[in-house]
Design a protein with these regions (language model features):
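Short alpha-helical segments enriched in small residues
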Residues: 1-172
Length: 172
């Protein structure tokens, strides 16, 4: 399934439900928001997005608590959840989706290349994906391996993973 098809599914389901989404991205640097915006009519569902590539911006823009960043770092489950919660609040969206991880070519602070966290915050709770184990309110949605490839490939796969999680969550 291509990212474009999945993005169309996400946007269509949000419009049909009268809901909106906002993104907070680190390793993908806005690629998720751009992919969603490629869908005609996306402005009815896409509120906006934050690119928080620098760790300090996760706190100042996305409202990730400083304690979370100090204790867990920028590449962590807790950070992804806080980013999703923060962007949902900052942008006034029904859904917040975040991406943080390591695109390479080198590991970062003990985290391997291809480690990606997708956070999601919605009307019914928060969830997170790490190495593909997705859950929302305790329901496991799917699984996958660490992402592999060069920086560009990992970033594209991260976007595809975030879109796939949104499709699964939106499908109920």
């Amino acid at each position: 399934m291509s990212s474009t098809v999945t993005a169309r599914e996400v946007i269509t389901s949000l419009i049909d439900a009268g809901q909106t989404v906002a993104t907070c991205e680190s390793l993908t640097a806005g690629l998720l928001a751009a992919t969603l915006a490629d869908v005609p009519g996306a402005s009815a569902a896409l509120r906006g997005g934050l690119v928080t590539y620098a760790t300090d911006l996760k706190h100042t823009l996305a409202r990730v608590p400083q304690e979370v960043l100090v204790e867990h770092g920028p590449v962590a489950r807790e950070t992804a959840i806080a980013m999703a919660d923060g962007v949902r609040d900052v942008c006034g969206a029904d859904w917040g989706v975040s991406l943080t991880g390591v695109a390479g070519p080198d590991p970062q602070d003990g985290h391997p290349v291809g480690e990606v966290w997708v956070g999601i915050a919605g009307p019914e709770g928060t969830g997170v994906v790490h190495a593909g184990v997705a859950e929302l309110a305790g329901t496991v949605l799917g699984s996958a391996e660490l992402l592999v490839g060069d920086r560009a490939a990992i970033r594209r796969q991260a976007v595809a993973a975030a879109l796939a999680v949104m499709v699964q969550v939106r499908a109920g």
